[in-house]
């Protein structure tokens, strides 16, 4: 009594976030602590009971079991923690935060406590997983976060999925060595659009400086040089809103990933095109500005109207109206990495795009 402690400060953070409309991804305990034996099954039950009773009435909690760990390590501890929380708190969503380049569905897709799947596509560029044999996808596909979304959505029971940890803006490629170069705004845009257009229900954005709340007097990690409040001005951070604006301009719950919308070559690595659609609209993300053949018959409408939408600044430009089945589109700016655009197609009678103007 009279002492402002750890859990008092946790309460303050959660309530401060709630006042600002922010949800907290509540990582109960970091995976490394469980792996090293810092919490057993009985302790997980007691801890889960404490957490659930303390926060079950907070409106802005999303429970995250695990903490950057493979789900086959101390599985009994994770199941006990999750089931205990769920037995008390039946209102909040729950998922599992897996290790890099893995997916929660590998271990918990049948678990009654799992509400949605999460994958960590991680921070490595193509070719950096040389000796990693525990990842879900083969070497050479490290940046293809869309593959995790597709893999998850092929599982049964079908659960929503999200990339919980893609490459962060301004963090080293490969995470640890600044000499490898840093991920930039065009990279974090690509991860966001690839994942969402491949079927993820949302996206996680990260920034190296914001992650560490880097401020004067604190030693930086991962080669960070920018203070966290200065990083709020970085382009990738401010461009995430344009993806949300785009997706919510169209009927959300009928949207599916559909790569058959691409009549030509879907492409590999940075040339990969990713399409998503509803009944009468289609969105295609093109990271390199290359020509692409699109099957307009995949959506309803006698004629289709087309626009280019810029993920960099949300600018919208009208292309024209089409009645043919397959049409070739190429945005301005040339064929190069980071010249990314979204092709919007709608039934010619629909007014969805007005929300973007």
Where does each model-flagged region fall?
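Active-site mouth of glycoside hydrolases
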Residues: 1-128, 133-135, 139, 143-144
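Short amphipathic alpha-helical segments and helix-helix/interface helices
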Residues: 14, 52, 82, 148-153, ...
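Short, electropositive alpha-helical surface patch
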Residues: 41-51, 180-183, 222-227
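Short, flexible, glycine/charge-rich loop motifs used to bind or transfer phosphoryl groups or to couple energy/partner
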Residues: 51-54, 84, 104-108, 150-152, ...
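Catalytic-core region of carbohydrate-active enzymes that cleave or remodel glycosidic bonds
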Residues: 111-126, 130-214
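Aromatic- and carboxylate-lined catalytic core of secreted/periplasmic carbohydrate-active enzymes
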Residues: 157-161, 168-172, 184-320, 332-357
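Short strand-edge motifs at loop-to-beta-strand transitions and within beta-strands
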Residues: 327-329
């Amino acid at each position: 009594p009279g002492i402002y402690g750890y859990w008092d400060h946790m309460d303050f953070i959660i309530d401060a976030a709630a006042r600002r409309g922010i949800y907290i991804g509540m990582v109960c305990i970091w995976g490394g602590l469980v792996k090293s034996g810092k919490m057993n099954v009985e302790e997980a039950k007691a801890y889960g009971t404490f957490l659930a009773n303390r926060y079950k009435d907070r409106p802005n909690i999303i429970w995250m079991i695990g903490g950057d760990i493979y789900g086959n390590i101390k599985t009994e501890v994770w199941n006990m923690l999750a089931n205990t929380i769920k037995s008390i708190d039946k209102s909040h969503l729950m998922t599992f935060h897996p290790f890099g380049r893995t997916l929660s569905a590998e271990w918990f897709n049948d678990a009654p406590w799992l509400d949605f799947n999460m994958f960590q596509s991680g921070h490595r560029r193509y070719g950096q997983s040389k000796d990693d044999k525990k990842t879900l996808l083969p070497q050479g596909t490290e940046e293809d976060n869309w593959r995790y979304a597709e893999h998850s959505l092929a599982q049964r029971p079908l659960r929503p999925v999200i990339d919980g940890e893609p490459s962060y803006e301004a963090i080293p490629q490969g995470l640890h060595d600044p000499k490898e170069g840093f991920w930039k705004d065009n990279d974090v845009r690509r991860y966001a659009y690839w994942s969402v257009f491949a079927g993820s229900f949302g996206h996680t954005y990260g920034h190296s400086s914001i992650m560490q709340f880097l401020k004067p007097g604190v030693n930086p990690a991962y080669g960070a040089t920018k203070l966290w409040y200065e990083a709020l001005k970085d382009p990738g951070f401010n461009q995430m809103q344009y993806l949300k604006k785009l997706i919510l301009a169209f009927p959300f719950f009928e949207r599916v990933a559909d790569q058959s919308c691409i009549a030509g070559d879907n492409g590999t690595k940075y040339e990969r095109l990713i399409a998503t659609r509803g009944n009468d609209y289609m969105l295609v993300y093109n990271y390199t500005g290359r020509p692409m053949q699109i099957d307009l018959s995949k959506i309803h409408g006698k004629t289709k109207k087309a626009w280019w939408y810029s993920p960099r600044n949300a600018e919208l430009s009208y292309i024209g109206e089409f009645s043919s089945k397959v049409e070739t589109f190429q945005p301005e700016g040339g064929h190069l990495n980071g010249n990314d655009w979204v092709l919007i197609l709608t039934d010619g009678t629909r007014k969805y795009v007005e929300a973007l103007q």
